[in-house]
Amino acid sequence: MEDKSGLPELTDMSLWFKNNIKDLSKVTKIEEFPNDKRKVFDNTIYASSLNGLFSDCKLFSNQTVDSIISKINIKYLSDKNAFINTFSGLEIVTKLNLTVWDFSNLEIKNMKNMFYGCKNLKELKGIKNLVNSKTVDINTMFADCSSLEEIDISDWDTSGVEDFSRMFDGCFNLKKITGVIDMKSCKQYAGMFGVNQGTGCKNLKGLKIKNPPNGFFLSGLDKTQYEII
């Protein structure tokens, strides 16, 4: 089904499960999308926003999340805040694979808290081109992902990001970040790799940063853990 503009019918999936299921505290899986009466697009939903999509979905399993992701098409995301808190409610998920989503032509400005609190997440794939020159806020994006060991951001363009605050705060087991973090437009970065040594990325090595702001200092790392290129 398409409207007169030639676009498919779009669905705002902000807080989708929280708004459609009375009590999420014991829900472990979803058989069908709640209240989706249309059942069109061959079980595909074209989303306009994913803001808070998995909010409060603490017991959703890897399999449940993978199934939901496979049914969502993000080609027409129009909300510039579409990725705020998208996965932040997932507490037991150990793997996320977003390769079915193509981020290359999106212009999402705000990704604050996108994966915040995914404390059992060990493996994250399919985030190529997630952050681009239009992205402004990645505050707390991976904060408290305490099981995450490595991440590949080699295809990211962070040159337009203004807020890096607490981006990796609480990522105790993070060992490797593949790629370079460009802080050309940075205005805020407090606690980027930990508010202090106690919440810092103590196992991280070989971090590469370019264009740091004046007076650059990372509270959660020591200078042997990163280099300015």
Regions from the PLM with identified roles:
Residues 1-229:
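Negatively charged
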